[in-house]
Design a protein with these regions (language model features):
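A generic structural motif
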Residues: 49-51, 76
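Conserved short histidine dyad/triad with adjacent acidic residue
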Residues: 16-33
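Double-stranded beta-helix
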Residues: 1-19, 74-106
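Histidine-centered metal-chelating micro-motifs
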Residues: 27-28, 65, 69-74
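Short, conserved beta-strand element in jelly-roll/cupin
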Residues: 32-48
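Short acidic-glycine-tyrosine-enriched beta hairpin
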Residues: 53-69
Length: 106
């Protein structure tokens, strides 16, 4: 499933995603947001750590991660880099806890 199809699927839910990309091994330190976030891996891979929950969510193309506002998360980009689609929602639009949805299941 390509980026255009993933964008269309998110748009069908009323979301307006942007995209971003990072190189192999890039790291995002633990942080939180005041808004809900929907992430979809479009290419490559990325592993999100959820330190407050003691969980890890590995995303490959087509996988989705819903992060409610206030969720502490960190990430490490895979060896081939990553391109993700990201949409923001008002805090409270997504029900906790964070939810990883594999490709084909959302």
């Amino acid at each position: 499933m390509g980026s255009a199809e993933l964008t269309a699927r998110l748009a069908a839910e009323g979301l307006r995603p942007g995209s971003w990309a990072n190189g192999p091994g890039d790291v995002y330190a633990a942080h939180v947001h005041a808004f809900d976030k929907v992430l979809v891996c479009a290419a490559g891979s990325i592993v999100f750590g959820l330190p407050g929950r003691g969980e890890v969510a590995a995303l490959r193309p087509g996988d989705r991660l819903d992060l409610p506002a206030g969720t502490v998360h960190e990430a490490v980009v895979g060896p081939e880099g990553v391109t993700c689609l990201e949409a923001h929602l008002p805090a409270g639009a997504l029900a906790p806890p964070p939810l990883r949805r594999p490709a084909g299941e959302w």
